[in-house]
From Swiss-Prot:
NCBIfam families given in the database record: GroEL, PRK00013.1, PRK12849.1, PRK12850.1, PRK12851.1
Segments of this protein annotated with the region Disordered: 526-546
SUPFAM superfamilies assigned to the protein according to its UniProt record, in alphabetical order: GroEL apical domain-like, GroEL equatorial domain-like, GroEL-intermediate domain like
Complex formation: Forms a cylinder of 14 subunits composed of two heptameric rings stacked back-to-back. Interacts with the co-chaperonin GroES.
Subcellular localization, as worded in the UniProt entry: Cytoplasm
Major localisation: cytoplasm
Name used for this protein in its record: Chaperonin GroEL 1
Source taxonomy: Bacteria, Pseudomonadati, Pseudomonadota, Betaproteobacteria, Burkholderiales
Catalytic EC class: isomerase
Source organism of the structure: Burkholderia vietnamiensis (strain G4 / LMG 22486)
One GO BP: protein refolding
Composition skew (Gly residues), residue ranges: 534-546
Database matches in Pfam families: Cpn60_TCP1
Protein task: Together with its co-chaperonin GroES, plays an essential role in assisting protein folding. The GroEL-GroES system forms a nano-cage that allows encapsulation of the non-native substrate proteins and provides a physical environment optimized to promote and accelerate protein folding.
Gene that encodes the chain: groEL1
Catalytic activity: ATP + H2O + a folded polypeptide = ADP + phosphate + an unfolded polypeptide
Length: 546
């Protein structure tokens, strides 16, 4: 095991604080509408230009081990805030730096770090309650667009696109972000349920222009096993042919004789069919087949439920108004399932979301809810160059997370104003002793830091603006984009409550840990062994007799 370097007390803390400051100073230049860009080097290709706090934080690794520990702890603040609320990473970093800076002064003067932390925690809890009180619900399209615009660095076109997407697919709908092919942003909305499986044979195509198979008013056969023997399918195919309607077969796989027969029938015009593989794998495949069954009002033909293909009747088949099958996707529009059954299924999946432990599972379950309840919208980001597209795509994703957070917990005045107003809840707060009171003061000072940084990035005098905003009431604040004092909510400068709350809680959590640190253990840098003496050996035997 390698030898370790153990550093105690102020020596450990001061080095870690240096790391905190290096990271925070790089991140905080991006805050606000007049925030600056940060250029990130890439080992391959051109550099990346960004105004996203968490992207900057993730790139920073420091040479000094102790400094790097401090930087990594604040990086955790940015990452956690981004994971929980989707935005507010720069605000969280600025708050953490301020709490650490002010707290270190008190620790150096001999105050008890544990009591300081208790005071900080008490103040943050009171501020969070106040934020919840002053929060207002975010319901209208205009408010959703405003939240998206602010989060995308005051780009109103992004806010409008997100509001339009949410309007089309509902609050529960899935909205994804992809690279576009043109200069302008585009919005594609897929109504109904779409899953990523296409036709098993190109001979099923009946619309050559679009290269898709379109089925109007079809039956839907759902089976959880492979279908390779046509005899299994014959009874149900005869019933569908009598009804004179097309058929979509969704099974684990359709192959061999069964697939060949379906293709021949399709080409000859005897029976219009399309076969696709079932989406997902394992247990998720079963669940998705069940979702499709409920959406189309059919049943999954599985041995577990006592149903077999040979005995299947039209009653077990699902139905839909229209189905489009492409090379890679299948879209079921207007399934014939009962609204009550669909609602019950959505409720069931929502319960699973609450119980899910991994982010991946939660995301997949959320997608299932969206496919059952609303639809899927795809925002295609357009830009002139790849560098610009990457930067813009990151901003759109940020804005999307922020709007979801706003719909969830409501909105407060942006531009650092909400934190200034929440200070009123802490102003009269007292701790159990003088050290806890100092902790409360630390948070009071830190809560004006985001506004100070926004104003500083805008090139104005921070102290003057902070005093003017603090003297005002309600949503009165400073709009750094225009340089005017306005009602922030009316001006459309708003933040999701969840973002502001999460930023404050995460910043206080990590800053408290730093303040109460009294020793740091790091690996000693390895010393490379010197090269052995003497000339390196040459290559013998290269002479040639002429």
């Amino acid at each position: 095991m390698a030898a370790k370097d153990v550093v105690f007390g102020d020596s450990a803390r001061s080095k870690m604080v240096e790391g905190v400051n290096i990271l925070a100073n790089a991140v905080k230049v991006t805050l606000g509408p007049k925030g600056r860009n940060v250029v990130l080097e890439r080992s391959f290709g051109g550099p990346t230009v960004t105004k996203d706090g968490v992207s900057v934080a993730k790139e920073i690794e420091l040479k000094d081990k102790l400094q790097n520990m401090g930087a990594q702890m604040v990086k955790e603040v940015a990452s956690k805030t981004s994971d929980n609320a989707g935005d507010g990473t720069t605000t969280a970093t600025v708050l953490a730096q301020s709490i650490v800076r002010e707290g270190m002064k008190y620790v150096a003067s001999g105050m008890n770090p544990m009591d300081l932390k208790r005071g900080i925690d008490k103040a943050v809890a009171a501020a969070v309650e106040e934020l919840k009180k002053i929060s207002k619900p975010c319901t209208t399209n205009k408010e959703i667009a405003q939240v998206g615009s602010i989060s995308a660095n005051s780009d109103s076109s992004i806010g409008d696109r997100i509001a339009e997407a949410m309007d089309k697919v509902g609050k529960e709908g899935v909205i994804t972000v992809e690279d576009g092919k043109s200069l302008a942003d585009e919005l594609d909305v897929v109504e109904g349920m779409q899953f990523d499986r296409g036709y098993l044979s190109p001979y099923f195509i009946n619309n050559p222009d679009k290269q898709v198979a379109v089925l109007d008013n079809p039956f839907v056969l759902l089976h959880d096993k492979k279908v390779s023997n046509i005899r299994d399918l014959l009874p149900v195919l005869e019933q569908v042919a009598k009804a004179g309607r097309p058929l979509l077969i969704i099974a684990e796989d359709v192959e061999g004789e069964a697939l060949a027969t379906l293709v021949v029938n399709n080409i000859r015009g005897i029976l219009k069919t399309v076969a696709v593989k079932a989406p997902g794998f394992g247990d998720r495949r079963k669940a998705m087949l069940e979702d499709i069954a409920i959406l189309t009002g059919g049943q999954v033909i599985a041995e577990e439920t006592g149903l077999t293909l040979e005995k299947a009747t039209l009653a077990e088949l699902g139905q839909a108004k229209r189905i489009e099958v492409g090379k890679e996707n299948t879209t079921i529009i207007d399934g014939a399932g009962e609204a009550a059954s669909i609602e019950a299924r959505v409720k069931q999946v929502r319960t699973q979301i609450e119980e899910a432990t991994s982010d991946y599972d939660r995301e997949k379950l959320q997608e299932r809810v969206a496919k059952l309840a609303g639809g899927v919208a795809v925002i295609k980001v357009g830009a002139a160059t790849e560098v610009e597209m990457k930067e813009k795509k990151a901003r759109v994703e940020d804005a999307l997370h922020a709007t979801r957070a706003a719909v969830e917990e409501g909105i407060v005045a942006g531009g650092g104003v909400a934190l200034i107003r929440a200070r009123t809840a802490i102003a009269g707060l007292t701790g159990a002793n003088a050290d806890q009171n100092a902790g409360i003061k630390i948070v009071l000072r830190a809560m004006e830091e985001p506004l100070r940084q926004i104003v500083t990035n805008g090139g104005e005098e921070a102290s003057v603006v902070v005093a003017a905003v603090a003297a005002g009431k309600g949503n009165y604040g400073y709009n750094a984009a225009t340089g005017e004092y306005v009602d922030m909510v009316e001006a459309g400068v708003v933040d999701p409550t969840k973002v502001t709350r999460t930023a404050l809680q995460n910043a206080a959590s990590v800053a408290g840990l730093l303040l109460t640190t009294d020793a740091a253990v790091a690996e000693l840098p390895k010393e490379d062994a010197p090269m052995p003496g003497g000339m390196p050996g040459g290559m013998g035997g290269m002479g040639m007799d002429m």
